[in-house]
């Protein structure tokens, strides 16, 4: 449990392709100590990592490698470092994406990334706006993070994306969301990793409470 928020250091990964300030402002409003960085020293000394993301998958992966954070993130997850990944940040955790050209990801989560355009017929792509989350009770980590349920049930969160993840294992899925005729994985919870396709930092109090609850549940 986190006793003193100001002493809990959060490293927001800067790989030159993301809107860092909205998540920084959200975490600061919760009184957490944040730093925007790609420094190995800062990342290693942090208590939690945030991997945000806006942009193209292949460019994002390339930038992670250029800033030497690609292998570092893989290593830290192996050692159970707490991580929050958002939108493209969530997609980069997977093995590959078909956006523009097939590109390998971090392979932290088994599965890959697909375009809505392959599955949708009547609704507009991208998926933009507020939508519900349906909890997957088969998730293997929900017992530890049980307090998250009350911040998900009957709450809406803000989405903006054209691609979605398809995890190999249902036990990694925290929530599903339905967009027209497609039911997709909208968040992952695995050990100390929370990954969201939606933007909690743009989801008002619902998003702030979800972030705060996850961090408070970390041992």
Indicate residue ranges for each PLM-predicted region.
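Short, surface-exposed beta-strand/loop micro-motifs that present aromatic residues
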Residues: 182-189
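Extreme N-terminal starter segment of soluble prokaryotic enzymes
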Residues: 6-11
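Acyltransferase
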Residues: 2, 192-219
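Beta-strand-turn-beta hairpins that frame and shape the catalytic cleft
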Residues: 154, 189-193
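Short acidic low-complexity segments
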Residues: 34-45
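Structural motif
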Residues: 50-52, 195
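Cysteine-nucleophile active-site neighborhood
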Residues: 48, 55-130, 212
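Pocket-forming structural segment of enzyme catalytic cores
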Residues: 97-181
């Amino acid at each position: 449990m986190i006793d003193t928020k100001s002493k809990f250091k959060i490293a927001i990964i800067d790989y030159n392709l993301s809107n860092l300030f909205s998540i920084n402002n959200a975490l600061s409003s919760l009184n957490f100590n944040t730093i925007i960085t790609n420094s190995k020293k800062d990342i290693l000394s942090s208590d939690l990592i945030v991997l945000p993301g806006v942009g193209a998958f292949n460019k994002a992966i390339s930038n992670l490698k250029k800033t030497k954070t690609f292998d570092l993130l893989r290593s830290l997850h192996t050692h159970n470092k707490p991580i929050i990944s958002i939108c493209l940040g969530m997609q980069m955790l997977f093995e590959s994406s078909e956006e523009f050209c097939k590109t390998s990801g971090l392979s932290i989560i088994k599965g890959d990334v697909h375009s809505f355009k392959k599955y949708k017929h009547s609704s507009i792509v991208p998926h933009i706006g507020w939508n519900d989350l349906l909890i997957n009770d088969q998730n293997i980590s929900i017992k530890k993070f049980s307090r998250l349920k009350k911040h998900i049930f009957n709450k809406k969160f803000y989405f903006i994306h054209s691609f979605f993840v398809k995890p190999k294992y249902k036990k990694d899925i925290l929530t599903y969301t339905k967009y027209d005729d497609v039911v997709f994985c909208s968040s992952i919870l695995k050990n100390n990793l929370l990954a969201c396709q939606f933007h909690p930092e743009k989801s008002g109090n619902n998003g702030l409470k979800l972030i705060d609850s996850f961090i408070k549940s970390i041992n």
